């Protein structure tokens, strides 16, 4: 297992220092005892670890309602970090409220109203404006990015309790009702899962009854790819990490912040142990010495559920390698694998330059197997039938020449939004008609996002294109996390593209100029009644070519889709094939 020296060495770079003039010492006010008590309570009796900084910050804010300057200073002292290091981490993440000396704390209750694609189409922006005047000064109303419940738009979160299909009356009632926590979902728990045959495959792999190479071969034959968005072949990733020197680590990404995506939430709410078993199989086959699970802060009930079920797994098998559950803090960029690793290490979630890749130099400087939750969820269903000689329920599916199953998060102007598990290669028209009950009454298909905000936009005339990895590139789009956002003749593609670009500008980590400046500049230019097509095209090309990570590289996609498929909306010359919105 990785030791504390390795953890510290991999967690943060060496510290430089400057000589300070002896006759000009820096003076600081002594910390009050209450600040040290608050920091000590946040540590909860643990040996202080710099990589757990974000968790300590969460505990401070959970207890005190905000991050007060004295508390941050005391926490830095306890962790033996510079105050600036703690401050830069706390100020990076959107969910932390820093209160400087002399400033007033925020109201005790915050209502967060989603304004991302699906919720904006359902009136989320107007809802936020209404609540800001209705709820009074003792409640803070924030407009926030996607909260992962797009199938129930619009959504407001009162404290930590989501109000689905929200309106001003239902949110006001939730505020008055006083309940602030979301109840645990009715998921399949450990005892029920094990009684139905769960964990038998993992035990067979662990005992050596089933060889690791056999498991990898089954994944290879099924064609399982990373289902968080990148689509990298899972079997190849397992082989690559297994070939690296020990200790090897594992990071699981449940930070599904892509607007329109909620499939991982669905799987955790219904059958979390299928994912946990897949994770344990992967860990054994690859030779993993420690596992870190990173779940988005917007899913507090799922975090509590997962923590409890992991405790039951540890109780059943006490000799498991360490498994740590970490929560994010509202940074979309931490869905990128290297930014997530930086966050797990207790730092700002800023993507790393590559190479080296995380499979070689990842978490705490060690080779790291990184996977999305859904990828691991399918492992048992692929491997068990393959070993039994039966048909593979994953690879035997598919249409239009594609292979496998996909979990589509469908939202927008359809009658029945939700997670649809169906054939890879299905078309948008087939998906909506066969699984979503068609369009809402009175609505006609005008266009859709095939892969969330970053996946670009396609017009209705391209509703018969197969939806899968590698099928949408010719149209300047990609499937990504398979977040399908459907819009109708009552929507404007340009407004949705502006929404997406403002989201990317808000979520840019700021590390590289093409993304930091490019998203902000594009968002400004896109507000003009007539777009400057040449300038926006040049700006988008620069962002795609020069940005460090996928955020800046994909941010121009919706903008470029409007120029290509909906030029009539932005005063750009071109044939109007889509019909006026």
Language-model segment annotations:
Residues 17, 21-111, 115-147, 151-180, ...:
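Ferredoxin-type iron-sulfur electron-transfer modules in oxidoreductases and energy-metabolism complexes
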Residues 93, 271-285:
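Histidine-anchored nucleotide/phosphate-binding helix
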Residues 158-160, 411-417, 450-451:
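Short strand-turn-strand beta-turns centered on an Asx-Gly dipeptide
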Residues 174-221, 371-394:
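Flexible inter-domain linker/hinge segments
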Residues 193-200, 252-264, 358-363, 409-414:
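Gly-rich Lys/Arg/Thr-decorated short loops/hinges at beta-loop-alpha junctions or inter-strand turns
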Residues 205-244, 393-396, 409, 421-422, ...:
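Accessory "access/gating" subregions that flank catalytic or transport cores
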Residues 278-282, 424-441:
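Short amphipathic, charge-patterned alpha-helical segments
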Residues 303-424, 436:
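Hydrophobic alpha-helical positions that pack around
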């Amino acid at each position: 297992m990785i030791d504390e020296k390795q953890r510290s060495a991999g967690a943060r770079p060496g510290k430089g220092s400057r000589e300070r003039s002896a006759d000009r010492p820096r003076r600081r006010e002594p910390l009050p005892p209450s600040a040290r008590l608050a920091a000590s309570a946040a540590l909860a009796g643990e040996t202080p670890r710099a990589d757990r900084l974000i968790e300590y910050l969460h505990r401070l804010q959970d207890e005190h309602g905000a991050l007060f300057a004295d508390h941050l200073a005391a926490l830095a002292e306890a962790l033996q970090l510079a105050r600036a290091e703690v401050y830069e981490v706390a100020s990076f993440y959107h969910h932390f409220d820093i209160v400087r000396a002399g400033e007033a704390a925020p109201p005790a209750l915050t209502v967060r109203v989603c304004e991302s694609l699906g919720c904006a189409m359902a009136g989320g922006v107007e809802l936020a404006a209404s609540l800001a005047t209705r709820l009074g000064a003792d409640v803070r109303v924030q407009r926030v990015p996607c909260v992962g419940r797009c199938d129930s738009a619009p959504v407001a979160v009162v404290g930590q309790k989501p109000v689905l299909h929200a309106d001003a009356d239902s949110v006001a009632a939730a505020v008055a009702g006083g309940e602030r926590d979301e109840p645990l979902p009715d998921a399949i728990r450990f005892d029920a899962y094990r009684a139905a045959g769960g964990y038998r495959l993992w035990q067979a792999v662990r005992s050596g009854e089933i060889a690791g190479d056999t498991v990898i071969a089954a994944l290879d034959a099924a064609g399982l790819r990373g289902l968080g968005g990148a689509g990298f072949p899972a079997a190849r990733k397992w082989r690559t990490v297994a070939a690296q020197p020990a200790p090897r680590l594992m990071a699981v990404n449940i930070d599904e912040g892509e607007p329109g995506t909620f499939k991982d939430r669905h799987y955790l709410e219904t059958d979390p142990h299928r994912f946990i078993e897949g994770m344990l199989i992967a860990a054994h086959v690859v030779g993993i010495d420690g596992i870190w699970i990173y779940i988005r802060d917007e899913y507090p009930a799922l975090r509590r559920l997962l923590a409890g079920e992991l405790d039951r797994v540890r109780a059943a098998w006490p000799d498991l390698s360490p498994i740590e559950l970490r929560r994010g803090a509202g940074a979309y960029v931490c869905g990128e694998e290297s930014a997530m690793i930086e966050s797990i290490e207790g730092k700002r979630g800023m993507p790393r330059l590559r190479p080296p890749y995380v499979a070689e130099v990842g978490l705490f400087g060690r080779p790291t197997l990184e996977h999305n939750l859904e990828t691991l969820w399918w492992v048992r269903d692929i491997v068990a039938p393959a070993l039994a000689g039966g048909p593979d329920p994953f690879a035997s599916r598919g249409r239009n020449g594609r292979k496998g199953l996909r979990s589509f998060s469908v939202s927008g102007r359809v009658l029945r939004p939700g997670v649809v598990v169906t054939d890879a290669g299905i078309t948008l028209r087939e998906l909506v008609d066969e699984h979503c009950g068609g369009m809402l009454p009175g609505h006609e298909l005008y266009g859709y996002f095939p892969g969330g905000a970053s996946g670009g936009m396609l017009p209705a005339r391209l509703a018969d294109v197969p939806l899968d990895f590698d099928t949408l590139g010719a149209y300047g789009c990609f499937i990504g996390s398979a977040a399908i956002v459907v819009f109708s003749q009552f929507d404007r593609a340009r407004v949705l593209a502006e929404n997406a670009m403002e989201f990317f500008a808000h979520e840019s980590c700021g590390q590289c100029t093409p993304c930091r400046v490019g998203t902000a500049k594009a968002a400004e230019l896109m507000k003009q009644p007539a777009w400057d097509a040449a300038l926006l095209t040049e700006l988008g090309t620069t962002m795609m070519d020069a940005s460090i990570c996928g955020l800046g590289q994909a941010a121009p996609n919706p903008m470029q889709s409007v120029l290509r498929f909906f030029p009539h909306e932005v005063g750009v010359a071109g044939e109007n094939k889509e019909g006026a919105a």
